[in-house]
């Protein structure tokens, strides 16, 4: 796009000779709002409008600029005076110059003057006839002798003229035509040369009338009064005749200086210079006064009103701009939904419900693209400005050569509800038993595998978790895949996560294949599954729809072969191709921190060829690939399209779902990664909101508001994201869950210090702290909870929230007994003979000793006997003997009260 040319306001003001305030006011009247600042830019259209309005001011400025010619005019008379003297000395040579200058047809004035000179020559030839046959040099000597009296006047002018006389004589001796640029001086020389021949003509100075006094002096000394009169008359005639061909500006200037310079001063030089400078300065001042003060003085009050109105408008604009800025968000493209809600100052539940109304399935930690962010922000009345990371060069795809395109394997994602047999089905296909290695028998990571069919075709499988906490993982799998397989248990039907998986696949625009699993069970009912799918607008081919379906059994292997054939058939229809010769690009599936090797990233190469030693940029991290492993852990040297791979060498753990790309140089990758880290860091600062007075008031109104701070560490980024998403959903009006920090890797010392400073608990998901870290946690009193199953972590935090780690303990009084007698027995201690007055006394219950209404001891029963028989419980109306652990100070009439403590969970 060609940018429209603009002009700064200060430049316009100089060109049009108008103040910037006036320009801003006029543009405002024309409907253009422009700030009254020198650097404000206006368009050419606005400049044309201003040029038409202020054309007079521009013309005034041009006329004022022309006054500078007066300074050059002062110099010209000096030059003319200097020219007169040498011209008289070189009178015979000037005749030759005149003959040469006749060849110049450009200027009319010299031709007219020449005719007049010829007339004078007709009068004087008899006097000069004897001198004509002599050489020119001799004539110069003869002429110099009669002009001796004129040399007496030269000393008066030598101080100003002597140097330039020499220059003019040299120019006349060398050439009279060489310099054509100062054409205006040509006729001047001719005029003054003629004045030198006939002293009446030398006074002509037709162009420069200011110097007519100088020839007068020369005329008085060298000629008679009659000659003077004769010279004055042709002088006026020459001025009138030569005024036509000469420049009009000089004629006007001559007329200006006639009455002022000549009438008042008889001396030619000193008065001229002084008066001309004053005149020029006065005229400049008067002109500038007209230009600068004419309009402003006349409308000074108007301008004051305009300034006040402009100031008020600027203040209103500033207030309006501040209000707009408050509704303008500066975000990166891939920001989490929770961070977006924090920036807009709305609750995450409100944002999620709005997304549901818009037909968008969004989780708390799901990163939103630019379109989704714009739509959501618009619903809440915000404008979005995206911060550019300067990655346009990364988005530019290399032009694919059709010869380099080769067929690639399809990427298939298996999705569905939890416990519907997704991983078991994949186990049968791969002849492995992955489910036995997963904690709790459920998939908690997104796995990437490669399978070779009997026909030799390759298929890349992505196994996604089915638990509701792993919504973001399923969304990433749907975006990454070519074909989606929805696994539904034939005995369970369509479940909530089944619907969610179908919606993810639809939003991603990928083909769907329905796999009805557990067909080997007697209660399997595939027709019911198809009916439920029909209610979701998913019609299988058996019901006249477009979606393929296949009944399978992960135990017996029924229908698995047919399912693979349908996958390959769908892939053929898609005509999947990729270029294996260009630099690799793809998506990060998972990222983890391996204690012995460093950051390990699981990626899916979607295009190009990835090799060891390539510089890779993934999200905000980069690095040179040190090693590559396939899904079985075997080292490989390169990976082509549709190949799942694990790579080592990144300087950090990228987020699951980040795009990766092989870069040309390490410097390029480092620069982009640094920019992204800066933006993410700034984004984190902006999303951290401090408590406000309104929030304090809300918490005081609730009365028992509490906040649960959590530091979350996990083995892979996907699990950390899923667990963080689930925990944030537990927040209520009374209890707020805050994830202070989340990351990939083991629990380290910095996590303990952060927890100690912020009164937080640490949750580790499939990670363990090192012994020094555990000791530091015990020293600081920091609680570390470790989990391997996401269910347990969520449930424990939920329970902790209900009681904030201190469940309510209810005390139930079971009975009481009064002390009737005291017995001291050696080896046993004090035994109280009691009578149960209420309830029952149970040996395992706690008791308290009450004397005169005051509790003096709380403990447990050591022995409880009825007669000599040890009892577990004594009911009302019976006597018993009670001995208390570590307490012998019993007295008659003491009351022994039995009670039990029962923990009651506080419900939210």
Swiss-Prot record:
This is Translation initiation factor IF-2. It comes from the Bacteria. GTP binds at residues 416-423, 463-467, 517-520. It comes from Amoebophilus asiaticus (strain 5a2). NCBIfam families: IF-2, small_GTP. Residues 517-520 are annotated as: G4. Residues 407-577 form the tr-type G domain. Residues 463-466 are annotated as: G3. One of the essential components for the initiation of protein synthesis. Protects formylmethionyl-tRNA from spontaneous hydrolysis and promotes its binding to the 30S ribosomal subunits. Also involved in the hydrolysis of GTP during the formation of the 70S ribosomal complex.
